[in-house]
Structure formats: structure tokens, C-alpha cells
Amino acid sequence: MIDVLPAGSFQVEGADSDAECLVLVNSKEANSVMAEEDIRGLFEQIKVDAEFVDLSKETVFDYTGYDNIVFAMVDSSLLGQTAYEILDWVQNGGGLMVYFPPQGDYFFRSLASQMGVQESGWEMYEVPGFRFRTDLMLGGQGKDFIIEEPFESAHTLSLSDDCTVHMVSADERELPLLWQRQYGDGMIVVMNFGIMGKAYRGIYAAAYSLLNDAFAWPVINGSAFYLDDFPSPVPSGTSTYVERDYGISVGDFYTNVWWPDLLELAEKYGIYYSGMVIEDYTEEVESPFVPNQNTQRFQYFGSALLKNGGEIGLHGYNHIPLCMEGFDADFGEGYIQGTYERLFDYDYWESEEDMRASVEELIRFTEDLYPAVTPEVYVPPSNILSADAREMLVREFPQIKAIASIYFEGDVEYTQEFEVAEDGIIETPRVISGCVIDPFMEISALSELNLHYVNSHFQHPDDVLDEDRGAASGWEAMRGRL
């Protein structure tokens, strides 16, 4: 059962409250624009009330009434004498965070010694990955996190002994990437990292928390393991890798190998699965929708899932996303029309009435099979959900309390933040997926564990059939990596 908090309890304080942080940006610098977007998204989640000053438009501002200041610009010389005055302010008890490495010019070098920099080179450093020297982040210490597409993002430098280094590059050099330094009565925190984005928010939140003796923000403290397309019709016949490793049909593999293994993992790690029902894999998009009469496996798997503490949710009458033609017409700048048709071999729904009828049939099917269950979570097929369909779900199906799609922006997918939307729907995105957890997902999982105290994962039964999702390695290897 999902308990819903009022939407207002998740919102940042109103504009009439005093901002605790001043963020200095420059809208004429690409990195600064990226950082501002990053900071706004982060601060909304950790409930920091901040004021932003664009140094390309105003260079005279009052910084004395804030607890903390964030530098998020490439050219720090825009600050002029104010930069030294801010350092004096820090010395008297303020907090200063350098959000990304500024331009390594003479002006910044004149400030760097106060930030703990002993020596600095002129070249930038390609960070192959990172590791934590301290226990700043849960699950971070003692492991290397690899960056799949590194670039020259960090200053080459060495630090004075009075710096506490939390994060370094994951190589022999161990270049300092995140450190703090007590400066008089205040604190300076430097992110010499230069890689930003949603996947790294938890690291930046942890860095910001170092500015003060104590810092708290609201967290969810929860974990979710979604089984998309489960229960669902089981494919007939066998598959290349199941036949290779087990010599049995896909149906027998699911029943006798895959599902028992998942139950064993659930018992070992205290996992409760959320199974998202697909009634049929028909391509029908016009009502009336024919009920699936072959329910034996639905009853077997669904009952076992519920018996083991799991939940049943809604995925689709079929696996066609709830979208009508033209749903992506307003996707905005950067989106190429036709992307949906190019990437996905799906038909469009004929009308909103047809979409509604398909969900009605799915709910009837699910509640007939599991009378004690009222499904409250909806997962969009292929994580795609049109705005019209979302509005329809909220309006027509009040039993749906949460929508679980994805956290990171895709091509046409429904992207979410962890929040309660204005219409009361709980947005609960999934962060990682599948059995092959790649380096990006490892970083994302670490970040979200520390930002929201959340783990949110989904997989499909047919992952083991799909070479792109690791099937060639075999289920034993996939299970081990999971």
C-alpha cells in the first residue's frame, strides 16, 4: 500500500524565504550553463534555497547574507577584487564550493593557494575513473568507478597537507578530484572533476554537505526491484542460449531455473519484487480487446510473487506504449521527428478511448487473477508514455498512485525525477536495469544511493534471451553479475 504525502510537502520553500546559498554563474560559458542546470536540479532535490547571479549581466552583488557560495564559472577573473573579498568572508565563517575546475589562468592561480593548491600545471587531465579515500559516500570506499567516455576535465595539481582529500582519479596518479580545506573559521570545498549530469548528483550533494558542520536533506530510504513483463505470456519453443546451456524450452527454463534463482536471491538479500503484468503480446490497438484465457502461468508466477511479499502492478494489455500519432510533435528543440518510428516497431493507438479500454481490460484481468490485489503502480511499455495518456491514466484510474519509468533522459522515453507531481502521482523512476550492470549504471547506483537513499532496478524475464542484454554469457554469468 502506498501512502501519499501532500505534493506541497515535497516542494522547496517559497521565494519569500531567505536563500541560504548564492550561486555565481556565467550564461556566456557552456560549462557554466551546464552547471547551472545541474545545480538547480540538485538543489531542488536536497531542498537548498539558492539565488543565482549571472556574472555576464551583473558584477556587483551582495554575498554577505548567505551561508554558502558556489563558484560555477570558467573565467573567475570576472569577479575581480570581489573574489578576494569572498575569501575573506569564508575566513570569517562562510562556506565556498568550487563546482567545477575554472580556467587555469593567472587569476585563478592567485586564489588557488587559499583553496589548498600547492602546485598546478597548465594542462588538463583525462580522468579514467574515480575512487574514494574516505567514507564520504555509502558504498564508495574501496572500489574504482570507471568513466566510460573520459575527457580532459580536471586540473593537474598537488595539494597542501592540510587538505582532506575524499576522491581521487582511479589510476596510479590518484589526482585529487574532491577535497575540503578549513580556511580560518570557514570551509572551502573543491570539485576538480568537471563531469556533471544526473548520474553524478549524489557526489555533488555529498560535496556540498561538507561546507557545514551538519547538513541534512530529505531522503526516500527505499529499494525497488521491478520485473517488467512479469507475469506475462511465456514465449513458446526454445532460444539459442537456453538450448545451449540447459537443453530445455523457454517455458521450462523460466519455471525451473530463472524463477527459483530469483526467489533465492530475494531470500538471500531481502528483496521484494514488483511484477508488472502484460496480459498479451497482441498488436491490437482498437477495442474491444479479447481477454487472454491462458492464465495458468499467470496464476502460478503471480501467486508465488505475492506469497513472497511482492506486489503486482500494471504494464499493459499488450506491449504497445500508450501513444497516438503525433504525440511527440511538441518534444522541442533537438528532437528529430520520426525518432519513435525509427527506433520502435510499434503501432499507434487509434484513440484515447482505445487506450482507456486496454487499461480497463488489463485491470479486470489482473484483479480477476489476484482478487486480494489492487494494482497501484503503472510501468509504461518500453518506458514510453505520451502526455495525453498520462493525463488519461490520472483522470480515469484513481487507483494508480505511482508511475515508474526511467530516471535518465532517452530518445522518446518518459523521463522522471523522484517527486510527487502536481496531480498527486508519485513519480518513481528506475535508475539501473538488467543483469549486466555497466560502469555508468554503477556510478548512477552509487549516486542515487547517496542522494535519495534509493536503489531502483528493473529487469525482464527475456533478458536471458537477448544477446544485447548479455544473453550470450549465459544465465549463470548474468545471475552472478546481478
List the model feature ranges, each with a label.
Residues 77-143:
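A glycine-rich, often tryptophan-bearing local segment used as a flexible ligand/cofactor-contacting loop or short
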Residues 28-105, 256:
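Helical hinge/lid and interdomain linker segments adjacent to catalytic or ligand-binding clefts
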Residues 19-21, 154-222:
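A glycine-centered loop/beta-turn motif at secondary-structure junctions
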Residues 394-437:
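His/Asp/Glu-enriched short active-site or ligand-binding loop at hydrolase and phosphoryl-transfer sites
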Residues 196-198, 214-311:
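Active-site beta->alpha N-cap acidic-glycine motif
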Residues 192-195, 215, 221-234, 266, ...:
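Catalytic grooves of carbohydrate-active enzymes
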Residues 54-58, 81-84, 173-176, 293-302, ...:
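Alpha-helical scaffolding within the catalytic cores
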Residues 20-26, 90-92, 100-112, 267-386, ...:
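Metal-dependent polysaccharide deacetylase catalytic core of the NodB/CE4 family, i.e.
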